[in-house]
Amino acid sequence: MTLDGGPNACLFVTNRRFESDDGPLEERFGNAREEILKFGYFDTKIQPSLGLGMLIDATAWFQNEEIQLIEVRELEQAAFVRQARTFIQGSPYRSLLVVVHGFKEAFPSALRKTSFLSHVLDVNTPVLLFDWPGNQGSMLSGYRRARRVAEASGAELARTLLLIIRGNKSRRQVFT
């Protein structure tokens, strides 16, 4: 569901801190957490040959060739809520799939893998990625840092869910 009706668009919320003001938006996010939420929209082009087995070996080729980021755009909170409402109300079951990415994921990778998951599941519902900065390194100390960041990010995830719920005053809300 895209702003213009295409099938590969998703919304995102992240509590990653900007590392840079230069370059594409998806490349500016680092691995530091902050309480300020950033909202946005992204769209991808997925190669028709892409299959489920390719996620197992998510090489750089897979990341960059099979799933291409077409557009990554930041939205103000109010615009994000309006877009989420439009997506949800336009879906057959007035639903939203929330994908939480973090551990050992850089932001561009989380965008691509979320799009891939949406594509493979083919559930005909809009998708929201909540991404926290879990790429803290692969050693034990990195795992421990990632765990602390994940625990602290729970408050931002809760705020995100409340924002979606309050922005969509539908009669039915199911959490599983």
Feature locations, PLM:
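Flexible, membrane-associating and regulatory peripheral segments of lipid-active enzymes
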Residues: 1-128, 136-140, 164-167
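Conserved structured core elements
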Residues: 107-111, 151, 155-158, 175
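Alpha/beta-hydrolase active-site loop
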Residues: 144-168
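Alpha/beta-hydrolase fold nucleophile elbow
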Residues: 168-176
